[in-house]
Amino acid sequence: MMNEILAAWRWNGSVSEPVPYGEGHINQTYALTVTSAQGAKRYILQKINTDTFKDPAGLMENICGVTDFLREKAKQRGADPARATLHVVPTAAEKPYYQAADGSCWRVYDFVENTVCLQQVQSAEDFYQSAVAFGNFQHQLAAYPAHTLHETIPHF
């Protein structure tokens, strides 16, 4: 099964076996490494929880739209777009996700090195920095055309 999933992307090198990554509560997340003559590059592979997100196409359209928008904002302010927002790696068919033969849906992101994802606030400073990051995120999206977003969890 995993071979089918990995074959859906064009990898520039040899692909390691995906290993579980992080402590996510919704999607199943894996890290993998692609090694080539140019070196090693890490990626995040996620199995989308389609019990929660029943419209994976709409979900991925939202994610791609928002991250493309944020990437342009990052470029405009001189920030590194590779660190400023997630980057969805398209499949070999140029789709933002792959639906496997069993119906499961998978996506790949570039791994953003030297970052952390807190599962729980440990200090007031953690809470403050999380609030600052969320405020910046909201500010950057102020001009985003919200009417284009799909409702991915109805009545949530």
Q: Where do the PLM segments sit?
A:
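Juxta-kinase regulatory segment immediately upstream of eukaryotic protein kinase catalytic domains
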Residues: 1-19, 70
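Conserved ATP-binding subdomain of kinase catalytic cores across diverse folds
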Residues: 17-35, 39-156
